[in-house]
């Protein structure tokens, strides 16, 4: 079936143009839809995402922040703002936003992967190893998760409270990682 002239078809066409990296065409289409549906948050979020993906970071951040004033804590908008900060290499700002999102989505493995990457880039190695261990755990990679927790414990050697929490996690995780001979 060919793409027609319905609004749904136009929106789909805008997404296709975005995937093809034809950002100008994509913005034209979704902007026309925004004019027709000025209160549609999905269309507005798509515009913000196109700005980010096209590298128009300043416009993306301004537009996204205005939308977040209306829809505080909106997941796709918050993630988009974090991505804009990542493009600017402002990893600390991106980390703060992703940490806020993590509070509401603690087992979202894509979020955990992105957050650990941002923490590594911001040189927050303790945060990186803790978050990466969560990502690995929820991905079923228990031995790798255990190694990350052990590295986090090493980094936190002077913070006894954090070491205690990490040690508890290690003990729990060790129940998932059994010697191969005892698994049979």
Identify the function of each model-found stretch.
Residues 1-66, 97, 141, 151, ...:
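Extracytoplasmic and endomembrane cell-envelope/extracellular-matrix remodeling and assembly machinery
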Residues 103-132, 137:
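Intrinsically disordered, low-complexity segments enriched in Gly and acidic/Ser/Thr residues
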Residues 52-53, 80-83, 87-89:
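Small-residue-rich helix-loop
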Residues 55, 75, 89, 123-126, ...:
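Short coil/turn linking the two alpha-helices of tandem helical-hairpin repeats
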Residues 36, 70, 104, 121, ...:
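Structural marker of alpha-solenoid helical repeat scaffolds
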Residues 11-12, 42-46, 62, 76-80, ...:
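Alpha-solenoid helical repeat scaffolds
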């Amino acid at each position: 079936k060919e793409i027609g002239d319905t609004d749904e078809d136009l929106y789909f066409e805008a997404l296709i143009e975005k995937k093809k990296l034809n950002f100008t065409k994509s913005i034209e289409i979704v902007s026309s839809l925004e004019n027709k549906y000025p209160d549609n948050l999905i269309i507005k979020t798509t515009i913000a995402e196109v700005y980010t993906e096209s590298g128009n970071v300043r416009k993306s951040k301004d537009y996204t922040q205005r939308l977040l004033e209306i829809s505080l804590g909106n997941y796709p908008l918050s993630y988009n703002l974090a991505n804009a900060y990542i493009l600017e290499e402002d990893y600390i700002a991106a980390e703060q936003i992703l940490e806020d999102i993590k509070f509401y989505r603690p087992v979202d493995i894509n979020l955990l992967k992105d957050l650990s990457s941002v923490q590594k880039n911001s040189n927050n190695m303790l945060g990186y190893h803790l978050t990466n261990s969560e990502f690995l755990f929820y991905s079923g990679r228990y031995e790798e998760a255990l190694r990350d927790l052990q590295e986090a414990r090493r980094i936190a050697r002077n913070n006894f409270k954090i070491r205690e929490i990490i040690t508890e996690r290690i003990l729990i995780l060790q129940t998932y990682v059994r010697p191969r001979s005892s698994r049979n």
